[in-house]
Each structure stands twice: as structure tokens, then as C-alpha cells.
């Protein structure tokens, strides 16, 4: 294998600023490729058009561990968390910002609390645009908690959003924890079959990026996911059979149902 040089030709290429272009515009215009991307399963698009197939053997969060919520209306959630993984630099459009919204609900079929992905946004935005997005999403979802890791661009956003009256919280998953340690800290939730996602393309992008980690090209959605799920776990909203028994009772009075993001 070492004697071979791997040559990849992704259908869509990006420059350092994050601008997209077709590799062969005379044959595949960018607009047609984007339409093709929207019509294909994420894993097939990554493998066939981006030349980036990923084996599931090394996945820390396997796609098969996710549960798919097929109802168009999500369950009534007792507590919701919005989590943001901000780009490293405030004015760098080459980096992604990932904003996810999650809810915890009681599953009557399994008689325990489960987690569901309610919304996910992954975009390249400069700081003013990111701030506007966070404010609008907070108004739309009215989460019980909005958490940002105070590093790089997230620290500036944390201060700015708080000044505007949004009760954003600082959350550090663990001093010195690397990305793999964070994923390992929540992988049991997926393996136990208590994490759900709706059958929408944006949700499948989260599933595929988690499956591709740590060998995938991007991990922004992975960071936002682990941030929220570690908060659920550390806050005591979700318990597994392996957790130690205690006398604490968790839960917040039910909230009304809300449609998924489209």
C-alpha cells in the first residue's frame, strides 16, 4: 500500500476562503452538482462525488446506533439544549460554525428518557452573521439552555450575546479533554439506542459526520453534538443502567410540541 500514491478528485473543490467551485464545470456545473448533492444520501455523496468513503469499523459513533424518528412531529420534550461550536476565527469564512438543538423526552415504550436531535445548522459565517443566526434560532426554539464553549470565536460570541439579554451559558466539557475523549464520553448513549434523529438530510449530515469521526474531513457537528450530550449527561437528565443509583429526581414539566426544522 505504501508504494501507491492516492489521488483524489472531488467533484466540488474549495479554496482557502471556503468558496466552492466545480472540478469540471464544463461537464458538471456547480449548480447541478449542488442539486445532485441535495438528492443523494450523504454517505453516497461523500464516497462517490467527494472521493471520501469512510469505513464504519473505526467509527466511535456508528450510524447504526442512531434511532430514526419517522413521525413528522417530534416528541414533547421536557428540556431542550442549543449548543454552538464556533469557528476558530471571527472573520474567517473557511471555518464552519455548527449550531445544534436537542431535546430530552420520556419514551413510554422503553420507560426511560431519550434524546432527540431537533435541528442542526452548519454554515460558514463571519461574526456578525453568526450572532444574528444565534439570536434568531434562540427566539425560534426558546431552549432551556444555550451553551457555548468559551474558546476562540465562541468566547467573543458568549460575551456579545449575553449583552443582548440572551442567557447563554459557558460550558467546558472537561479540562484537558481532547475530541476523542469527549466522543467516548457520550458514545454509550448512542450504543444504548436512546439517541434519535429525524429522517431529514440535515440530520443525516450529523449522523454521517459522527460516523466518520475521527478520520473524517470535518468534525464541527461532532463538537456541537458532544457539547450538548455531555451537558445532558452531566446535568443528570439522562441515565443509563450502568450509572450508579442515587435518590435524585430529574425532569422539568413538559413543553409543547414543535415541528422540526425543514
Task: Give the location of each predicted region.
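Mg2+-dependent endonuclease catalytic cores in nucleic-acid-processing enzymes, primarily RNase H-like
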Residues: 1-23, 27-35, 52, 56, ...
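ATPase catalytic-site recognition across NTP-hydrolyzing enzymes
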Residues: 16-87
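Helicase-core coupling region on the C-terminal RecA-like lobe
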Residues: 48, 53-56, 221, 241, ...
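Catalytic phosphate/metal-binding cores of nucleic-acid and nucleotide-processing enzymes, i.e., regions
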Residues: 74, 79, 103-106, 155
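An active-site-proximal beta-strand-loop segment
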Residues: 84-97
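Generic detector of well-ordered alpha-helical packing
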Residues: 86, 150, 220-221
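Charged alpha-helix within mobile-element recombinases
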Residues: 209-233
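Acidic two-metal-ion nuclease catalytic site recognized across multiple nuclease folds
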Residues: 228-262
Amino acid at each position: 500500500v505504501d508504494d501507491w500514491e492516492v489521488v483524489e478528485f472531488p467533484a466540488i473543490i474549495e479554496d482557502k476562503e471556503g468558496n466552492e467551485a466545480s472540478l469540471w464545470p464544463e461537464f458538471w456545473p456547480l449548480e447541478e452538482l449542488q442539486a445532485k448533492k441535495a438528492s443523494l444520501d450523504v454517505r453516497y455523496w461523500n464516497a462517490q462525488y467527494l472521493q471520501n468513503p469512510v469505513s464504519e469499523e473505526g467509527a466511535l459513533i456508528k450510524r447504526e446506533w442512531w434511532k430514526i424518528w419517522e413521525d413528522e412531529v417530534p416528541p414533547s420534550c421536557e428540556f431542550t439544549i442549543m449548543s454552538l461550536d464556533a469557528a476558530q476565527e471571527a472573520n474567517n469564512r473557511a471555518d464552519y460554525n455548527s449550531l445544534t438543538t436537542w431535546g430530552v423526552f420520556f419514551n413510554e415504550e422503553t420507560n426511560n428518557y431519550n434524546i432527540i436531535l431537533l435541528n442542526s445548522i452548519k454554515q460558514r459565517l463571519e461574526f456578525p452573521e453568526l450572532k444574528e443566526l444565534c439570536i434568531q434560532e434562540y427566539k425560534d426554539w426558546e431552549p432551556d439552555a444555550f451553551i457555548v464553549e468559551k474558546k476562540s470565536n465562541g468566547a467573543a460570541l458568549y460575551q456579545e450575546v449575553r449583552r443582548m439579554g440572551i442567557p447563554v451559558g459557558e460550558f467546558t466539557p472537561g479540562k484537558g479533554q481532547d475530541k476523542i475523549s469527549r466522543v467516548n464520553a457520550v458514545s454509550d448513549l448512542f450504543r444504548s439506542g436512546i439517541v434519535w434523529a429525524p429522517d431529514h438530510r440535515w440530520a443525516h449530515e450529523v449522523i454521517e459526520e459522527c460516523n466518520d469521526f475521527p478520520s473524517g474531513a470535518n468534525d464541527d457537528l461532532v463538537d456541537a453534538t458532544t457539547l450538548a450530550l455531555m451537558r445532558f449527561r452531566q446535568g443528570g437528565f439522562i441515565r443509563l443502567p450502568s450509572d450508579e443509583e442515587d435518590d435524585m429526581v430529574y425532569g422539568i414539566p413538559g413543553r409543547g410540541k414543535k415541528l422540526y426544522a425543514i
